[in-house]
Amino acid sequence: MALLRPLLLDNVASIQQSAALALGRLANYSDELAVVQNEILPQLVYSLGEQKRYYKKAAAFVLRAVAKHSPPLAQAVVDSGALDSLVACLEDFDPGVKEAAAWALGYVAGHNAQLASTVVDAGAISLLVLCVQEPELSLKRISASALADIAKHSPEQAQAVVDAGSVAYLAPLIAHQDAKLKRQVCACLSQIAKHSVDLAEMVVEAEIFPKILLYVKDVDQHVRKHAATVVREIAKHTPELAQLIVGNGGVAALVEYVGESRGNNRLPGIMALGYIGAFSETLALSVIASKGLRLLFEALTTEPEDHLKSASAWSLGQLGRHTPEHAKALADIGALPRLMELQASASSSEDLKVECKRALKAIVAKLTHLPALDALVQGAGSTEHAGVVNAVLAQISKVLPNDSSGRSSFVSSGGFAKVLSLPTEDGSETRESVDIISSCHPDEIVRFYSPGYSESLLKKLEA
């Protein structure tokens, strides 16, 4: 670094440029503070305003390479006074200089809200929106990416991006032929839409539906993922926005997307289906009718990553918590035993256990199908199941008094004996549920299936 710094001041322009490129490449692969410590940044910032376009590109490359590693290094770039010079470069006649500056600004803004605010305060947004309108593809991509990096941190920063008129220019670009540009545009729209209802409605009003749903089926998997993310970020806000997606055929597109994707690419689709189904029983039925349940269950069963299983469990819980019919649909595909198994598994993460437990409790609270409740009781083994078993017993105590045929099958299946064998404490909710269940059966049946009854009979014989 010490050897390269004097070359930045060389009289020969090509040597200056080569030195800057060398610095940029070194900084790009190392997060060491050498670039900052050798007072090279002020020299680069000065050169941004004075030198020719080739050197400007090289200098912006160095600033980008330094800023990308960490917030402290990005802050060092800000402290060197680079932002004003980089923003000025966005007005340069050379597209390459604009692109290099936009890229550096995006890296600075991407780290945290405070750094993004400094980029906003430097006046970058309106110029980045102008860059999106330029004919050069790479400049469009980098500018859209930089706007996304600004918008992602807070509603205020996303609103600043919207106020500059960005959505009107970004939205038509989702139909562009270039896959990388579509990817960046979708990423930016999703970062805007995620913050609030108003911002999501601004994105919707740019008439992205139903076009965006076509790109949930795009040949490029990254475009598909980012398009599904836009749908997810819009769906989560209100029933009206979720209904808009359903009305445009969004559920079928999302179900197909979840079925064809694997790994992390599935996550936006899984979450979007859960958000849509969470709002009302009608919207949940639209997901169930589109065969979404089986794909969510398949993800819960086959995906190796716990965070994907957690998302699937959450979505299943949102779909099954509305009515007995919704809950039975979950029971019919075998989702409840799997949720119970994951909730008690030692290999499951804490987040997965919590999501499975919440989903089970929400579904069981609406479940009136006695065979499914019976299966859950009999499948309960470890103390990890205790919280769920309490919810199941409470639900059985509500269902059983009104189901005479169910009482008989509950006894013959072994479910009643299992209930009586469960350890309970006097005065507990579990004890209360067991007493209600017992009161639905004749005393002879209760005695016969109570633990220790056979031993007491043998003692009578011996006597």
Task: Tell what function each PLM region has.
Residues 3-5, 43-45, 85-87, 127-129, ...:
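Buried hydrophobic core positions in alpha-solenoid tandem helical repeats
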Residues 8, 48, 90, 123, ...:
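Residues that form ligand- and interface-recognition hot spots within folded domains
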Residues 364, 394-396, 416-463:
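Intrinsically disordered, low-complexity regulatory regions
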